[in-house]
Amino acid sequence: KAGRLENRSGDLVDRAPRGPDGSGGRGITIGALTDLAKHRGVLGDPVVRQAMIRLHILGEVNRWNMLRAKAGAGRTGGEGNMAKLAMSELVRQSREVGNLVNGADGMLDRSDSSSGGIVQEMTLFSPAPSIYGGTDQVQRNIIGERVLGLAKEPGPAKGTPFQDLPQN
C-alpha cells in the first residue's frame, strides 16, 4: 500500500475491488479508506484511526472464519449463518467508517464527492445484507435452534396454517 500514497483518493476508490476481499460485498477496502482519510486530512484523528482499525480487525476475523469454514472437511454447522451475520456487520461498519471519513462530503453527489460516490453507494446498499438471504434475526434463530440446540420460540404457529394465524 505504500506505493500509492501520492495517488488521488478518487482514482483508488474507483478501482477498489468488491467482494470476498474483506470489503463486505459492496463495502470499501481499508486501503481505499486510508487513502480517502489522508486526502480528507483526517488520518491523524484518533477516533477515525480507531474506527478504521476496528473495521480492519472485523474484516480479518471474518476472512479467517471463512477460511476455517472452507477447511471444515464437509462439516456443516452454523458457519454459513455466522458468516452471513459477520458480513452484515462488516457492511454496516464499513458504512459508518466511510461516512466518518467522508464527513460532509457524504451528502454530495458522486461526481462532487471526494470519495467518487463509493461511500454514498455503500451507505444506500448497507441495509441489504441484513435482509437478503434471511434477516439477521432469522440467522440468529437458526444458529440458536440448529447449532446450539435451544428451544424454538413458543406459540401457535408451529401446527397452525398461515391463514388461521391471528392478524394484527
Sequence positions of predicted segments:
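Alpha-helical interface subdomain recognition
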Residues: 2-168
